[in-house]
Amino acid sequence: MSAQPVDIQIFGRSLRVNCPPEQQDALNMAAEDLNQRLQDLKVRTRVTNTEQLVFIAALNVCHELAQERLKTRDYASNMEQRIRMLQQTIEQALLEQGRISERQDAQFE
């Protein structure tokens, strides 16, 4: 489906952006999140320049994204390591099971 124009409000300004209909709710939630971030920054920093607030918010979001990427990378690496350990454990168990089966077969001959 093609993108449709959607009007959103960010920090008192109207913006019209193109958005696929199935992502419109996510866009509205993102706009609400950005509005809240900007409002919180304005109160916390006492900065009144909207452009400066937007840049600070953008830097904060980029930093959060970088942190989440690192956590995801660390998690994936940890899972890969655990999978390798499980594979080794399973392979070892299968080898031992094979040895036990060979001994049992030899006893019956």
Swiss-Prot record:
Residue stretches in coiled coil: 22-99
Lineage: Bacteria, Pseudomonadati, Pseudomonadota, Gammaproteobacteria, Enterobacterales
One GO biological process term: septin ring assembly
Entry keyword annotation includes Cytoplasm: yes
Transmembrane segments annotated in the record for this chain: none
Assembly, per entry: Homodimer. Interacts with FtsZ.
Similarity section: Belongs to the ZapA family. Type 1 subfamily.
Any one of the GO CC terms: cell septum
InterPro entries (alphabetical): Cell_div_ZapA-like (IPR007838), Cell_div_ZapA-like_sf (IPR036192), Cell_div_ZapA_eubact (IPR023771), Cell_div_ZapA_N (IPR042233)
Subcellular location: Cytoplasm
Gene3D superfamilies the record matches: 1.20.5.50, Cell division protein ZapA protomer, N-terminal domain
Organism of derivation: Yersinia enterocolitica serotype O:8 / biotype 1B (strain NCTC 13174 / 8081)
Keyword Cell cycle attributed: yes
Entry-linked HAMAP family: ZapA_type1 (MF_02012)
Cited function: Activator of cell division through the inhibition of FtsZ GTPase activity, therefore promoting FtsZ assembly into bundles of protofilaments necessary for the formation of the division Z ring. It is recruited early at mid-cell but it is not essential for cell division.
Protein's recorded name: Cell division protein ZapA
Keywords on record: Cell cycle, Cell division, Coiled coil, Cytoplasm, Septation
Pfam families (UniProt xref): ZapA (PF05164)
